Regions:
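Gram-negative bacterial Sec-dependent N-terminal signal peptides
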Residues: 1-22
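Surface-exposed loop/turn motifs in large extracellular/passenger domains
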Residues: 26-27, 32-38, 45-68, 73-209
């Protein structure tokens, strides 16, 4: 079993350049319209993704929203994804947010292009699960965390072999955050463990833990 802690040193060493259903127009998306959450709520879905493009999610200041994707048939499944139904923004505002991916795949995928932005203006943002990738962004996508984020990928019980990557930014995609706290744990079958891959992408953080 391999463990990784994402620190400024690790960043320098690891740089690689190379149960709720909502009606909607796309059956592969759980939430495809604006939503307000006044109380603590957990949404578990086996869709292709839970939150699709063109959506604003507002969480009450004292509330916590958990979004869990447990799709076991699609290794491309995600929790949040821009570009799945065209170029359009996604925004999260308000209280506490937890995004969890159970199974292979990715927690956040941003590939909507230059006209898409993924913005987190939440009190706290936690990304966790057994996915092989935390954030995967390309095609000039913009991902912004106003108050930072924590990423914890724990694949210690996984039996599928993958290349585990915390953050991958390619094709002029950029990620901006006040801080990033990242921990990666690979399973025995996984072939590699990398904190961040920059393939013509940009990563900017005021603080790394």
């Amino acid at each position: 079993m391999k463990y990784g802690r994402f620190t400024a040193l690790v960043l320098a060493l690891n740089l690689v350049f190379d149960g709720v259903a909502f009606a909607g127009h796309n059956n592969d998306i759980e939430i495809n319209s604006d939503r307000n959450f006044a109380n603590n709520e957990t949404i578990t879905s086996d869709k292709r993704t839970i939150v699709g493009s063109g959506v604003t999610i507002t969480i009450a200041p004292d509330a916590e929203l958990r979004l869990i994707n447990n799709n076991t048939t699609n290794d491309q499944a995600s929790v949040v994804e821009t570009g799945l139904t065209g170029a359009s923004d996604i925004a999260f505002n308000g209280g506490k947010l937890i995004l969890r991916r159970e199974g292979d795949g990715v927690i956040i995928r941003a590939n909507g292009g230059t006209t898409s932005a993924l913005t987190f203006n939440t009190e706290s943002t936690l990304l966790n699960g057994t996915a092989s990738r935390g954030i995967d962004a390309d095609k000039s996508s913009a991902v912004d965390f106003a108050d930072g984020f924590t990423l914890n990928l724990d694949r210690s019980g996984s039996t599928t072999g993958r290349d585990v990557v915390g953050l991958r930014l390619a094709k002029r995609a950029h990620l901006n955050t006040t801080f990033a706290d990242v921990k990666l744990t690979a399973g025995d079958s996984d072939s590699s463990l990398t904190g961040i891959i920059l393939d013509d992408g940009v990563f900017s953080a005021n603080k790394l833990n």
